[in-house]
Swiss-Prot record:
It comes from Shewanella sp. (strain ANA-3). The gene is smg. NCBIfam families: PRK03430.1. This is Protein Smg homolog. Belongs to the Smg family. Pfam families: DUF494.
Length: 158
């Protein structure tokens, strides 16, 4: 499923090619690209749920203290190792993510059918979430820079 998400993001979204609106046509295109029907359905559902997160009420985000600290569940810690969780914290500290977008990222990560995510894959999920979050264009651009720039010697995160 993650491969399909990456394919869609790289070939349609990130390249600024207009994404096919018709789900059947998109499914045919992905099938021609070599993806399996069941994985295509999972990826499209993942994207639909991402869009729904933008529109839904989020009562769990309403009453948070500005200085609160995110405690991860056991399942989240299994999927996001220390490096990934540290990177999420780093992105909050540099204002690329806020509480809302961080929770959207965690929600989307937990829906992936991968047992654990490596940092590079997490970066792409973050980019997808920020791309789909209205009003977060600057954060998207910062995240894009973090993904595509060449790491400098001695840098903590890239």
């Amino acid at each position: 499923m993650f491969d399909i998400l990456m394919y869609l993001f790289e070939n349609y979204v990130h390249s600024e090619v207009e994404l096919l609106v018709d789900e059947d046509e998109l499914t045919k295109e992905l099938t021609r690209a070599g993806f399996h029907q069941s994985e295509i359905l999972k990826a499209l559902t993942w994207l639909e749920r991402l869009a729904e997160l933008q529109e839904s009420d989020k009562p769990y985000l309403c009453n948070h203290d500005q200085h609160s600290f995110r405690i991860y569940t056991k399942e989240e810690m299994e999927k996001l190792d220390v490096e990934c969780r540290g990177f999420l914290l780093f992105l909050e500290q540099v204002k690329v993510l806020n509480v809302e977008t961080r929770e959207m990222v965690i929600d989307r990560v937990m829906e992936l059918d991968e047992p654990a995510l490596i940092l590079e894959d997490l970066k792409w999920v973050i980019l997808m979430v920020l791309f789909n979050a209205p009003g977060h264009e600057s954060a998207y651009e910062q995240m894009e820079d973090l993904i595509f720039e060449q790491p400098e010697e001695g840098r903590l995160h890239s």
